Amino acid sequence: MNTMLMKYTGFLCGAFSAKGRFVPYGNWQGTAISDSERELCSNFYYPEFVDFNYGANKNSISRFTMEIGQVIPVEVGHGEDARNVSTSVHSITLYQAPFGLMLFSIRIGLQCEAGDVTAVVARLRNIDLIHKTNRRFADAVLAPLMEAYRRYSRSARDIAGMDDDLCHTRLVEYGNKLKVFQIATTDSSEREGIDQDELLFELGTVAPVGSYDPENDFSPSKAYYDRIMDGNCVSVFNNWKALSLFDTFTFLGHDISEGNIENWISNYFGMIYISELFVKFYLFRLNNDFRISHKRADKLLEQFDEFEYSCWFDQVSYNFLPRLIHHSMEEGLEILTEKERLYQMIAQQKDKREKDDDQRMNNLLFYLTLFTTFSMVWDAGSLFNEMYPFETYLGSATEGFRLVSYTLLLAVLILIILTRFKKR
């Protein structure tokens, strides 16, 4: 495959459970938008969605950024093909989201051949290996994130005494690698002889460039390639196409203006993708709370209803393109399917628990009724004996008490049987 030089901006994203409100320290700075920017943004996006992303209440996302500003070499390739690719690490951002979730993104930049782009991303998104393969990146980027984790994570005590590699994996509480949002652009002159769909597929799957070639060991099957490209692509204009997958969202374009790129960064990544990642990570944790921690289903449903009311947006924009991008991200992350099935399972468990509770209560009432009945039998026998002395009418007090007891118990038994039959 011919080589292609490209300009690349990527965001490596993860999340962990957090406690308390984040208070900036050290080089962390809070980021917000002005009232005029909020008003302008609300002309394009629903005001409630803008408020969710930039509001100041407990049901909105607060953002904190630390500038890194370093160019870090990342070694890619093996053996004789090993080489260092200069990678600009611009900044890291924390997103304190509702329901105790802390998301983060690492912004990187590249200007290199397409093959080096996928190699760098493949290396950096595997967070469990970074400490061994790139100590400088670990110190510059992961160390500040780990400090935030130690201060605010709900599981910070669990990492005491752990190796650095294991500690870093805690930054990806849900999964084993970082999610990636990436923008790759080229000049028209670089496109000649290169199949753009194949390149988009390789970027989106973080596969070696050229792996589509049937002779390559990583070559995908035609059925898989067609399914991905037919079902997950977003294509509106001739100069770009996007691919929305579970682990990545990839924009590939040519002759794209800086203003357009900034729009993708600030809005499609900064608002839509971050909000969708929040939803996905929330569903991951909800599933864990339900299946692993076995938390009460009724409490989880109450929380889910609150989440759906304050943090779930079926539509986010007045305009067609943001709506299209939003729904493509939902589909790529498989959000709707997981959300519906998880809600259904929790609701079923809640109904089962309520039925079990009702059954236990009915059983308790049944035994109390029996106890009361036995007490009533003796009292009734004594009353009848006073009114109609058993020795006079039956010749024996014992026979009298026995007759009354059997009669009353038979009546109670018939009543219980009739009641149970009607319930069925």
Stretches found by the model and what they are:
Residues 1-234:
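Short Lys/Arg-enriched alpha/beta "domain-start" segment
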Residues 4-12, 341-424:
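Hydrophobic alpha-helical transmembrane segments and their immediately adjacent juxtamembrane loops
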Residues 89, 237-238, 402:
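Short beta-strand-initiation
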Residues 110-126, 284, 292-296, 392-399:
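Intrinsic-disorder/low-complexity, polar/charged segments
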Residues 155-168, 297, 303-306, 362-364:
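A broadly tuned preference for mixed-charge, low-complexity surface segments
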Residues 204-345, 349:
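Extended amphipathic alpha-helical scaffolding segments in membrane-proximal extra-membrane regions
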